[in-house]
Amino acid sequence: MTFGKQADPDLTKLLDKKLAIKLNGNRTVHGILRGFDTFMNIALKDTVEVVSPTEKYEIGMVIIRGNSILLMEPLESMAYVPKTE
């Protein structure tokens, strides 16, 4: 790890996985990760905005700016692969 240098996000293990994304403004969306860039902007497909446990809205394909993401949580199980350096 190098201090002072920002590393690119490594979200490749989350590609094609269903995620819960918490956004600023107290918004939450669930969707399947289709892509990302170095600024952690993400593309989600089959996206659903979760307003409450009983209120959900299907919004389809979306692009979310990285600076509005507070938390990303996988909703599917993932295989653990140790990082090699």
Curated annotation (Swiss-Prot):
Q: Which family does it belong to?
A: Belongs to the snRNP Sm proteins family.
Subunit structure, interactors included? Core component of the spliceosomal U1, U2, U4 and U5 small nuclear ribonucleoproteins (snRNPs), the building blocks of the spliceosome. Most spliceosomal snRNPs contain a common set of Sm proteins, SNRPB, SNRPD1, SNRPD2, SNRPD3, SNRPE, SNRPF and SNRPG that assemble in a heptameric protein ring on the Sm site of the small nuclear RNA to form the core snRNP. Component of the U1 snRNP. Component of the U4/U6-U5 tri-snRNP complex. Component of the U7 snRNP complex. Component of the U11/U12 snRNPs that are part of the U12-type spliceosome.
What GO biological process terms are annotated to this protein in UniProt? mRNA splicing, via spliceosome
Taxonomic path: Eukaryota, Amoebozoa, Evosea, Eumycetozoa, Dictyostelia
Per the record, the domain of life is Eukaryota
**Gene, per the UniProt record:** snrpG
Name assigned to this protein: Probable small nuclear ribonucleoprotein G
Any Pfam family: LSM
Q: Where in the cell is it found?
A: Cytoplasm, Cytosol; Nucleus
GO molecular function terms listed in the Swiss-Prot or TrEMBL record: RNA binding
Query: Keywords on this record?
Result: Cytoplasm, mRNA processing, mRNA splicing, Nucleus, Ribonucleoprotein, RNA-binding, Spliceosome
